[in-house]
Regions:
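Conserved N-terminal Rossmann-fold NAD(P)-binding element of oxidoreductases
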Residues: 7-11, 34
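N-terminal Rossmann NAD(P)H-binding glycine-rich loop of SDR-like oxidoreductase domains
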Residues: 13-22
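Conserved glycine-rich Rossmann-like NAD(P)H-binding loop of the short-chain dehydrogenase/reductase
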Residues: 27-41
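Rossmann-fold cofactor-recognition segment
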Residues: 43-56
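Conserved catalytic-site loops of classical short-chain dehydrogenases/reductases
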Residues: 66-67, 101-106
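Conserved NAD(P)H cofactor-binding loop of Rossmann-fold oxidoreductase domains
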Residues: 71-76, 107
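A short, exposed helix-loop element centered on a Lys and neighboring polar residues
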Residues: 91-92
Length: 110
């Protein structure tokens, strides 16, 4: 079995982010989710932080992230604040860590 890695994903309460989180959990990895909504994933290897990623000061302290997946997004009057500015702030906070392996930025619209 592969060694467990620590994956941080934004926007894990529904849609693409939830599916990605569930995939990494099935593979035996530790997943940390950040979302404005309450958790929708209940798994022993999952922890959830409920906050608004556009508020940099509210981002939790999380160390030793190995994979960062910026998935949170919106289509409303705040889309630049979430889809661009928050992505940059999240990457600055978690993407420049000693153990980081990969950063994936996801953008979608329907």
């Amino acid at each position: 079995m592969n060694q467990s890695i620590k994956v941080l994903i934004t926007g894990t309460s529904q849609g693409i982010g939830k599916a990605i989180a569930e995939y990494f959990l099935e593979m035996g990895h530790k997943v940390i989710g950040i979302d404005r909504q309450e958790p929708s994933i209940f798994h022993s290897m999952y922890s959830h932080h409920q906050c608004d990623i556009s508020d940099y000061k509210s981002l939790p302290e999380i160390d030793d992230v190995e994979i960062l997946i910026n998935n949170a997004g919106t289509q409303n009057e705040n889309d630049i604040d979430i889809n661009l500015k928050a992505l940059i702030k999240v990457t600055e906070k978690y993407g420049i860590q000693k153990h980081i392996r990969s950063i994936l930025n996801i953008g979608s619209a329907s």
